[in-house]
């Protein structure tokens, strides 16, 4: 059957190149393997040449697949399920790339693209290590190609093809309108592409419609992909039994991987800070943790590699750390994409990701089991110096620091893997007769504190070690030399810490941790300052000011600033939006929001918020995204020195779902940020006011009844002084002071105003929002009576409920990330 309006050529080319990439990567793997195993240079050279052609072909195919998929998405070819599922016509062009990584297929493709880039460089740069290293990378490419091939083997689906058409996907099978005669057992209509629901796509997840999500995933995936290079070198060393020589070639690659992966992780933190509404940048989310763990182990591996380079110690540990860093990249992929995390993560893929459960387990097994077999088989042959390191040597304390990083990673991944542990125990309970297998391990009630109470001590130890260790020499250090070098930085650090702790008002108190946890926070801040000052001083004391040779010290300065920024911004985070309006908006029991920490702003009414007067001025709808609204919140400092506008936004009833999806906004200063996001809005369809005013002529002391109670006119005040009104001396104004008594016994005070300004009469109404009551003072009668207009409406007026924080010293964190990456890049270049 010929279907109308379909564009089949891009998909046909895409499927062709997927098959080519699958076959070419397998050929490259086999040919590189044969090159390594060849007994003579002639055979080895032949196989290597074939492998290169195959890998170049595979790379071209992957780039072509990427380009074709982008063509389909950008041209809104909704006959393809991937384009329909992840994009729409209203999507801004700058977010089209983000459609790639919303789905499984696109993110695996992005990973594969970076492997191609790395492999093409290594074909020239790896020299004699090319064949064994590229065997590993080519095999990884084969595994990734199976993720997008989308074929059935022995009744099991292998991968998910991004070029599947809507009519092939099964999506239309239960849609009667898409079938001939409205019969789902009949063929799909030839003109199904002209049906209304096929004219636009399902749209991109609103959380991904942010500029950070255009740049964060490519950087993060480059970091993930690059961890295969030190892994491949370690694997090659074990395979070729050339245990130490590979380290020199691997070091700059490991540094590159650490820098890019670290920046990618913190870009994710920046995205969370600007796009998510939990009021921060790190929540110990399982997927955040799963990306952090490979980085921690990679950093540990870099330091043990440096120990080996200078002393010959720790080569075995270096092999292990590089194997584990790549292994945990695969494991993090397993956690993210199989749905095993369920609703414990805001990042996790679900749905079709469940089909990858065994597929990714196989990938992990094929990659890691051979590596561990080689490691343990060659363990005794890996060079190891029998003599223990001296306690006064640099390598001893570097190893301790590496071990702390490793143990920190194990603790984090252990807590993160609770859903996996519960699933394993549940599976075993049907096989083994042990009662404890039926007991699921519950996550901690306060997840953030459960991590923080351990990681604060990791931060303290690492901060101290980064400050001290560079002042030690490899192999041995005399105490006289050490104390002479370290004395001045230590005195400066103690002085700085004393000033910060004495005058910095570090008052972070957690009810679970008590004053012991507060003391740990103080100690962590002091040690972070020590790391910054001691490493900055070492650039001049140890390196004589030669920045080109000081990459390690610069990276340590940056890392100290990261720790300091985290501790200061978290311990001094201040809620600004305490409820001063008297309007309480209830939250669901499942919400983490507290009514007293959220301020409700009625449109046009100024409210008190800390050091600011804030006013909800107006709102506007996004020109393309009709479900997205921007809300203009005016801030004015009470001392009159500054005023500014913040524009938090929210998606309202996205795809028919109730509630809102807020996007924060923030005002940046050198020493703090003001951070605002919306927590509640009236539903737009409920905000249409159809009620009308009813006039009441009354005198002071009279009573007016309304549905839920009554109100008494207490007095009429001439020329009232009120912050809400801005009258000049030439204006005339009267305010009616009214007390409202509800049936529930609650009292409210209203003060509507009648005024004459520039010879024009006007009025300012007042509301009792919780009573749906609006009162306007519209006229003064000759007999000392006044006319009040009263209205009861289910939509009194527009309002927003928001939460606002002050994040102090958040820029210390961002600066630390940049400086850390800069230091690592300097070390890599050196």
Where are these regions (language model features)?
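Solvent-exposed, non-transmembrane regions of integral membrane proteins
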Residues: 1-830
């Amino acid at each position: 059957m010929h279907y109308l309006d379909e564009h089949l050529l891009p998909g046909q080319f895409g499927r062709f190149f997927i098959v080519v990439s699958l076959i070419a990567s397998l050929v490259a793997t086999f040919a590189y393997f044969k090159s390594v195993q060849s007994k003579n240079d002639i055979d080895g050279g032949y196989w290597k040449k074939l492998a290169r052609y195959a890998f170049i072909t595979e790379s071209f195919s992957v780039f072509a697949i990427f380009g074709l998929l982008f063509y389909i998405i950008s041209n809104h070819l909704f006959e393809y399920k991937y384009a329909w599922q992840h994009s729409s016509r209203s999507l801004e062009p700058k977010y089209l790339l983000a459609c790639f990584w919303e789905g499984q297929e696109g993110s695996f493709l992005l990973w594969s693209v970076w492997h191609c880039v790395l492999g093409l460089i290594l074909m020239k740069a790896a020299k004699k290590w090319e064949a064994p290293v590229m065997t590993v990378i080519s095999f990884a490419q084969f595994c990734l190609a199976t993720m997008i091939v989308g074929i059935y083997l022995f009744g099991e689906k292998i991968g998910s093809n991004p070029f599947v058409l809507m009519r092939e996907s099964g999506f239309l099978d239960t849609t009667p309108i898409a079938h001939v005669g409205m019969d789902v057992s009949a063929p799909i209509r030839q003109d199904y592409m002209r049906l209304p629901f096929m004219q636009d796509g399902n749209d991109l997840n609103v959380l991904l419609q942010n500029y950070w999500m255009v740049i964060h995933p490519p950087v993060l995936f480059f970091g993930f992909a690059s961890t295969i290079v030190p892994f491949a070198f370690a694997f090659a060393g074990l395979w070729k039994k050339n245990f130490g020589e590979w380290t020199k070639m691997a070091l700059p690659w490991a540094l590159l991987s650490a820098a890019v992966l670290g920046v990618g992780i913190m870009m994710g933190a920046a995205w969370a800070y600007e796009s998510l509404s939990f009021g921060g940048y790190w929540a110990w989310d399982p997927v955040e943790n799963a990306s952090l763990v490979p980085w921690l182990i990679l950093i540990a591996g870099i330091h043990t590699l440096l120990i080996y380079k200078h002393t010959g110690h720790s080569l075995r540990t270096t092999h292990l750390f590089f194997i584990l860093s790549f292994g945990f990249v695969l494991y993090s992929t397993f956690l993210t994409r199989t749905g095993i995390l369920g609703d414990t993560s805001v990042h996790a893929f679900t749905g079709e990701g469940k089909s990858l459960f065994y597929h990714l387990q196989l990938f992990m097994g094929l990659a890691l089991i051979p590596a561990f077999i080689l490691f343990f088989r060659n363990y005794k042959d890996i060079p190891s110096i029998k003599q223990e390191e001296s306690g006064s040597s640099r390598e001893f304390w570097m190893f301790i620091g590496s071990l702390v990083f490793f143990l920190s990673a194990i603790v984090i991944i252990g807590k993160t893997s609770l859903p996996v542990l519960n699933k394993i125990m549940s599976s075993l309970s049907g096989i083994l007769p042990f009662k404890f297998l039926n007991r699921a391990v519950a996550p901690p009630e306060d997840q953030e504190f459960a991590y923080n109470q351990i990681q604060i001590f990791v931060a303290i130890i690492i901060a101290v070690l980064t400050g001290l260790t560079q002042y030690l020499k490899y192999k041995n250090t005399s105490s006289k030399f050490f104390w002479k070098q370290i004395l001045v930085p230590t005195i400066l650090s103690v002085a700085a810490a004393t000033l910060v702790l004495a005058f910095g008002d570090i008052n972070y108190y957690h009810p679970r941790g008590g004053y012991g946890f507060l003391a740990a926070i103080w100690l962590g801040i002091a040690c972070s300052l020590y790391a910054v000052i001691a490493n900055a001083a070492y650039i001049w004391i140890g390196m004589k000011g030669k920045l080109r040779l000081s990459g390690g010290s610069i990276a340590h300065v940056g890392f100290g600033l990261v720790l300091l920024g985290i501790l200061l911004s978290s311990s001094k985070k201040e809620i600004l939006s305490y409820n001063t309006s008297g309007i309480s908006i209830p939250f669901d029991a499942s919400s983490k929001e507290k009514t007293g920490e959220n301020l409700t702003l009625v449109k046009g009414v100024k409210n008190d918020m800390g050091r600011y007067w804030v006013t909800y001025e107006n709102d506007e709808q996004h020109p393309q995204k009709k479900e997205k609204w921007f809300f203009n919140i005016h801030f004015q400092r009470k001392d009159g020195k500054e005023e500014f506008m913040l524009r938090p936004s929210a998606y309202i009833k996205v795809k028919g779902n109730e509630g809102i999806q807020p996007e924060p906004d923030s005002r940046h200063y050198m020493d703090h940020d003001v951070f605002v996001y919306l927590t509640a809005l009236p539903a737009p369809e409920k905000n249409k006011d159809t009620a009308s005013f009813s006039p009441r002529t009354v005198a002071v002391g009279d009573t007016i009844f309304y549905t839920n109670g009554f109100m008494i006119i207490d007095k009429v005040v001439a020329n009232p002084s009120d912050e809400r009104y801005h009258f000049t001396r030439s204006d005339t104004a009267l305010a009616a002071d009214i007390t409202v008594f509800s049936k529930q016994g609650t009292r409210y005070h209203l003060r509507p105003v009648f005024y004459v300004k520039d010879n024009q009469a006007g009025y300012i109404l007042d509301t009792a929002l919780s009573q749906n009551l609006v009162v306007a003072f519209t006229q003064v009668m000759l007999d000392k009576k006044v006319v009040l207009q009263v209205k009861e409406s289910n939509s009194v007026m527009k309002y927003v409920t928001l939460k606002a924080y002050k994040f102090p010293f958040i820029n210390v964190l961002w600066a630390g990330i940049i400086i850390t990456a800069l230091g690592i890049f300097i070390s890599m270049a050196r």
